[in-house]
């Protein structure tokens, strides 16, 4: 008899064929690895019970000067302030222009010349995408500032629930996004409707925008063929991403105040929320891959990119949102699969251990813990959820499945009659095995087995896949399992 350890490295591999994932985890949902041991992602619970009006696209948390905690959420049609006790207040500005819940694509069905091209062959990229409406939110001191990319005006809310957010006087209109610099200038991106223009206010005064010898207001026109999508504070600078490239804006003092530098090509971002900033680096999902910025732009190798980008709704790609989960050194991206108009899947990267994981979850915005004790995600249903709370996953199946585990070189048939589990609490997880003789041969399943120590099983094959399924609401742990296997012949 041979004791075969099933010791697979953390993370999933979903590029190429299933055989390419030999010796790796291949699929799963709501699992992570901590110090090499597999466990479930934390559960969630509702923070609010009333759905917000409109599609939520942005969320911000902060403390005011009295240490009171605040939360703001922007939807395509509303702006909300939510107190630390979860009281929801509509602070939508008077005269605000609601936008679009979904992205729209020009050049679709009914456009172009009839019978042009061949059936089943993708047409040239001649259409234009109008993104769904989202907000960029930041703080000006203890006050909230924000801008909807559809309405284009810059608003400020001064914490009084009885008052709506109000237009910032003298600020440009028709803007794409805003942010506040480390030097306390309010930035307008895509300012005045110019997709390449960046304007900023005087330092410490967000109502002075006209440059003069007595202030530090100004503007920069980026040298790019793209349009500005988003800006984020990173490493003491401002990283500005367009739909095709990347630029860095740095403070240089008088007379220019700020200057821009082109730092990367073919690394654009599809939507303003697809980027996360963690400590001293930024990471974002592009249209066909991932990139990081830590002073230099670098592509990020992704072991599940085939799976993600082969089944994604490219027309709604601007809805992708990235969320830090610093407690576990993770960045999560929520994205719409090809058959969905809204985000229904996630891809997660652990930047400390450099592994990837995938699963299903419907979230449209989120924020890391810090101001509040837990990460807060916003569902596509308009409900806010506290995450990493217990292990209740609202009925979602928690599982992980391996790629082929070949015994030896895979040329001999093995007969397996016993499983020796490695669980923290036996019975929390069931095991199902799938065996086949050749990579494309018919697959046979065995189980599920409720694991005891040891567990009697009976199956054979040249390659074996294993699926572990967790019982609901269990905080399980799985280490290195072993199979008791007897080698047979080559047939």
Predicted regions and their residues:
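Beta-sheet repeat architectures centered on beta-propellers
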Residues: 1-91, 109-118, 122, 126-129, ...
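Long, contiguous N-terminal structural blocks used for assembly/anchoring
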Residues: 91-100
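Surface-exposed intrinsically disordered loops and tails
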Residues: 100-108
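Conserved beta-strand positions in repeat-built beta-propeller and related beta-rich domains
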Residues: 72-75, 146-149, 188-191, 240-242, ...
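Structural signal for beta-propeller blades
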Residues: 79-80, 152-154, 195, 246, ...
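Beta-propeller and closely related beta-pinwheel folds
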Residues: 42-60, 95, 117-130, 161-319
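Hydrophobic or amphipathic alpha-helical targeting/insertion segments
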Residues: 140-164
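Beta-hairpin (beta-strand-turn-beta-strand) motif
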Residues: 93, 108, 112, 147-150, ...
